[in-house]
Amino acid sequence: MLAVFGHLNPDTDAISAAMVYARLLTRQGTEAQAYRLGEPNFETAYVLRELGLEAPPLLTELPAGSKVALVDHNESAQSLPALGELDVTRVVDHHKLGDLTTINPPYLRFEPVGCTGTILLKLHREAGLSVEPQDAKLMLSAILSDTLHFRSPTTTQDDRDAVAFLAPVAGVNDVEAYALAMFAAKSDLGNTPAETLLRMDYKVFPFGDPVQPQNWGIGVIETTNPAYVFGRQQELLAAMDQVKAEDTLSGMLLSVVDILNETNRTLVLGATEAKVLREAFGAEAEGQVADLGNRISRKKQIVPTLEKYFAPEA
């Protein structure tokens, strides 16, 4: 049985892609099972409730040599521990190629689109297989989530075309209303502990020297209610300090993205982070908050800028 899973701290695309791809592979004759590497966030939980589905089983480890398929990620820091000991047979992703190494030649499908769901729709078409309504809604939800309903600069025409095709198959007549309902669920943070908020959409990235990299943790909270998040600023800064120590990081950032206004204000933990934001982005931290303007995409606008900043001198 092939294990299919997305990244740690899974978002809607990571969980939806695992579920859809596992079913697609099974329909094509490869027995596959979807898994998750963490708890679904509030938005993903809403999508699953809408569909009457349970989240995939939680996966914490696999025996060395187990065959796996990765979706929505390919970097070891964002995946199952000891990924290098597993037989990665397939990767379907829309991120840059990271440090992935494999035991055997894998099937790779990378495309510069806004969401793995967009690629999975293409795989259905290429296989000559119909898209089931349940899978259509999972892919639709993932694309709306990853692209912030086309607000993100990662959005491509392929993503727009995919949504136009998937919405009627999924039975979603008003895409805007459905997207807003998803974002409202994502923003309903209630009394969630600060560290949980921080880790909901949190990834570790190695920058600089590949032999001795600087590992930075970059969290994102996408919300329609940023005032609530900043009302808990001191709690979040304390959680950032704790996570920075726990994960042995060189730096820690938390971007609070206002979905509707398409702005990013980032919490700045200390002097190290303030210096990097000033020199890399030209953003000054005031009251431990830096205004990063319309840089709302970690993948396309934050991480590449930091990679360039930390790049070793030739």
Curated annotation (Swiss-Prot):
Its EC number is 3.6.1.1. The keyword Membrane does not apply. GO terms for cellular component: cytoplasm. Its cofactor is Mn(2+). Keywords: Cytoplasm, Hydrolase, Manganese, Metal-binding. GO terms for molecular function: inorganic diphosphate phosphatase activity; manganese ion binding. SUPFAM superfamilies: DHH phosphoesterases. Binds 2 manganese ions per subunit. Its main location: cytoplasm. It is found in: Cytoplasm. Mn(2+) 1 binds at H7, D11, D72. Gene3D superfamilies: DHHA2 domain, inorganic pyrophosphatase (n-terminal core). It is an enzyme of class 3 (hydrolase). Mn(2+) 2 binds at D13, D72, H94, D146. It catalyses: diphosphate + H2O = 2 phosphate + H(+). The keyword Manganese applies. InterPro entries: DDH_dom, DHH_sf, DHHA2, DHHA2_dom_sf, Mn-dep_inorganic_PyrPase. It comes from the Bacteria. On the 2D-gel the determined pI of this protein is: 4.65, its MW is: 32 kDa. HAMAP family: PPase_C (MF_00207). Belongs to the PPase class C family. This is Probable manganese-dependent inorganic pyrophosphatase. It comes from Deinococcus radiodurans (strain ATCC 13939 / DSM 20539 / JCM 16871 / CCUG 27074 / LMG 4051 / NBRC 15346 / NCIMB 9279 / VKM B-1422 / R1).
